[in-house]
Amino acid sequence: MAYAVREGDPTSTGGVVVSASATHQVQERRLARMGDPVWCPACEQVGYIAQGNPTFIDEYVAVATQGHYVKCGCKRGTHTLIATQQSLAADMDATIEIPKDMAKAAKLRAEKMTAVRKAGGPSWDRL
């Protein structure tokens, strides 16, 4: 099943989704979408969700589901999302890649968040 990922959900590298949708929640946690930031302790960077499910849309953005890829400093395919709920799933297990313009904006946001973290900002690995 293509279970929806939420803010605070873990990743395969021990990371965590740090921010998500402002409009939709599941079990009192916001839905994660393509472009949303993810902390990665393996490479010590904030990355972003690089895939989404085209059958599940929030504010014109594909929602992230179990197994979708996180773009960070790690080798492609080694950092994926883990859904912690099983009450909400997409209609189909489908995947699209993040559009280039959205990826560019997500990368800039992730780089800024990484800089803040390195300067003593929030420690997401303690969530």
List the predicted regions and their residue ranges:
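Intrinsically disordered, low-complexity proline/glycine-rich segments
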Residues: 2-127
